[in-house]
């Protein structure tokens, strides 16, 4: 056997061993980039838009959610504001505002990184609509990056709900995201969700494919 053939085979074997040691699954996932948005209770919708008001649908999203036509302005403690923040429906039991770290700097608010729905002790924020305003003592977070999966996808990838994985972006910036949470539900479509800061840092666009390590 020629020396170059031996070298090639050796390299291939080493690559396989390295992948096994790192626990690489090779499972491919498309990326969705989430811009700042918020979820509201029906009571808060009415305080912002008027009594009896209901959100109107702009675009369907996964899991029965939708992007609403309605937008609001969010205001930090130093009266720094960000306008045209889109509401996602349907209404929830608790209102929640999700922003990026860059948004947090602009708002002048120290905002924790949290899983969606985990708002206890999170940052305060004011929300202003065309008919009124509300003040949330807590509810503003930077959403923890995560992957939505169906049970079938999770089984194929060898992961379960709540698992934490690392994900590699194979582009010119060769980025690896750690601390990516797996979220499994039968209503979910396979997609990794990151915010605009994370997407810009890794030069990722919506629909780009990444790989679970």
Swiss-Prot record:
Pathway: Polyol metabolism; 1,2-propanediol degradation. GO terms for biological process: propanediol catabolic process. It is found in: Bacterial microcompartment. Involved in 1,2-propanediol (1,2-PD) utilization within the bacterial microcompartment (BMC) dedicated to 1,2-PD degradation by catalyzing the conversion of propanoyl-CoA to propanoyl-phosphate. Zn(2+) 2 binds at residues 146, 148, 193. Phosphate binds at residue 92. Its cofactor is Zn(2+). Its main location: other. One of its GO terms (cellular component) is bacterial microcompartment. It is an enzyme of class 2 (transferase). Its EC number is 2.3.1.222. It comes from Lachnoclostridium phytofermentans (strain ATCC 700394 / DSM 18823 / ISDg). This is Phosphate propanoyltransferase. Belongs to the PduL family. Signal peptide: none annotated. It catalyses: propanoyl-CoA + phosphate = propanoyl phosphate + CoA. It comes from the Bacteria. Keywords: Acyltransferase, Bacterial microcompartment, Metal-binding, Transferase, Zinc. The lineage of its organism: Bacteria, Bacillati, Bacillota, Clostridia, Lachnospirales. GO terms for molecular function: acyltransferase activity, transferring groups other than amino-acyl groups; metal ion binding. The keyword Transferase applies. Pfam families: PTAC. CoA binds at residues 33-35, 78, 86, 200. InterPro entries: PTAC. There are 2 Zn(2+) ions per monomer; Zn(2+) and CoA bind inbetween the 2 domains in each monomer. Zn(2+) 1 binds at residues 37, 39, 98.
């Amino acid at each position: 056997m020629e020396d170059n053939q031996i070298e090639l085979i050796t390299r291939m074997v080493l690559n396989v061993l390295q992948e096994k040691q790192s626990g690489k699954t090779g499972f491919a996932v498309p990326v969705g980039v989430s811009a700042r948005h918020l979820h509201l209770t029906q009571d808060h919708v009415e305080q912002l838009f008027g009594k009896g008001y209901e959100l109107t649908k702009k675009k369907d999203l996964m899991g029965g959610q939708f992007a609403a036509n309605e937008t609001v302005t969010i205001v930090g403690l130093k009266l720094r504001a960000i306008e045209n923040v889109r509401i996602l429906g349907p209404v929830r039991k608790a209102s929640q505002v999700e922003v990026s770290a860059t948004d947090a700097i602009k708002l002048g608010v120290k905002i924790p990184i949290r899983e969606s729905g985990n708002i206890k002790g999170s940052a305060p924020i004011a929300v202003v609509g065309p008919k009124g305003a509300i003040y949330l003592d807590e509810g503003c977070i930077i959403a923890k990056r995560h992957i939505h999966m169906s049970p079938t996808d999770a089984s194929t990838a060898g992961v379960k709900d709540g698992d934490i994985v690392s994900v590699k972006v194979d582009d010119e910036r060769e980025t690896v995201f750690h601390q990516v949470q797996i979220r499994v539900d039968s209503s979910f479509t396979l997609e990794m969700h990151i915010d605009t800061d994370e997407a810009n840092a890794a030069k990722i666009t919506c629909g780009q494919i990444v790989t679970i390590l």
